[in-house]
Regions:
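Hydrophobic/basic alpha-helical segments
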Residues: 148, 157, 197, 201-204
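Short coil/turn segments at secondary-structure boundaries
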Residues: 20-25, 62-69, 88-89, 166-168
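Flexible loop/turn segments at secondary-structure boundaries
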Residues: 81-83, 120-122, 234
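Glycine-rich, mobile lid/loop segments that gate access to catalytic sites or pores
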Residues: 2, 6-13, 19-27
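Sequence-specific dsDNA recognition surfaces
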Residues: 32-35, 50-64, 77-108, 127
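Non-catalytic DNA-recognition/assembly elements of restriction-modification systems
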Residues: 1-4, 27-59, 185, 189-193, ...
Length: 239
């Protein structure tokens, strides 16, 4: 549903106009952009990701160095095993010097992009404190928090592909420079606010379901050995 909404609003440009009608289908004004080589809604801008976001590579650490603080860490496998939201229950823990690790903490509005595995695979992490990311991942931190979910869906279009500066499909080697050079359409602030509100509701529901599944899985794993050993019985007889 979230993906469909993104496509409808930002690929087909049928976001709601002032009357609540689909913009492009209702003959909303489109303007040709020579760099993108296509029409975009009037009033929308074209910018490079480097103008909109701060990028940084993840941590490379020495396992032989003694740490003083425990952190959750997002590895490439966490990205590969998820589709959009990273399962916080599946994250590894690592003890590192806080002086080093504090530079790699994942902020609330950050986007994570894999450099290996599935190149360009894009994910987000919700509500995880003291969480860092590994060196095979790039963090994208939008200057405007309203861009986070929009950019997440935009970047997910290019997973496992290579990328031209105008967003064409020709990221085998994902780097900060590659990402910074991508030219994208920037919607109006009003449309971004509406999209962010609607998608965040869906994300919150997805995150709730992930946590519920993790809780049920934990209960199953705890009960199964007890059932197999006969330490727990279920009375299925009728009263």
């Amino acid at each position: 549903m979230a993906r469909q909404l993104y496509d409808y609003w930002f690929v087909q440009f049928d976001f709601p106009n002032e009357e609540g009608k689909p913009y492009k289908s209702s003959v909303g004004k489109m303007v040709y952009n020579p760099i993108l080589k296509r029409e975009i809604p009037e009033g929308w801008e074209m910018k490079k990701l480097g103008e909109l976001c701060y990028f940084s590579n993840g941590i490379n650490y020495d396992k032989t160095i003694e740490g003083d603080t425990n952190y959750k860490i997002v590895n490439v496998r966490n990205i590969s095993s998820s589709s959009m939201l990273i399962d916080s229950e599946d994250l590894d823990s690592i003890c590192l010097p806080s002086k080093q690790a504090k530079n790699y903490l994942i902020e609330k509005n950050a986007i994570l992009i894999a450099r290996s595995g599935v190149p360009g695979a894009t994910r987000i992490v919700e509500d995880v404190l003291d969480c860092i990311y590994c060196g095979f991942i790039i963090k994208c931190l939008p200057h405007n928090q309203l861009l986070r979910l929009y950019l997440t869906f935009l970047l997910k279009q290019f997973e496992g592909t290579t990328l031209t500066q105008t967003g064409g499909s020709i990221l085998k080697n994902v780097s900060q420079e590659t990402l910074k050079s991508i030219c994208i359409v920037v919607p109006s602030e009003e449309i971004l606010k509406t999209f962010d509100t609607q998608i965040q509701t869906i994300i919150d529901t997805m995150n709730l379901h992930i946590n519920q599944i993790a809780s049920l899985t934990k209960q199953r794993d705890e009960l199964l050995p007890l059932l197999m050993n006969g330490q727990v019985n279920f009375d299925l007889s009728d009263d």
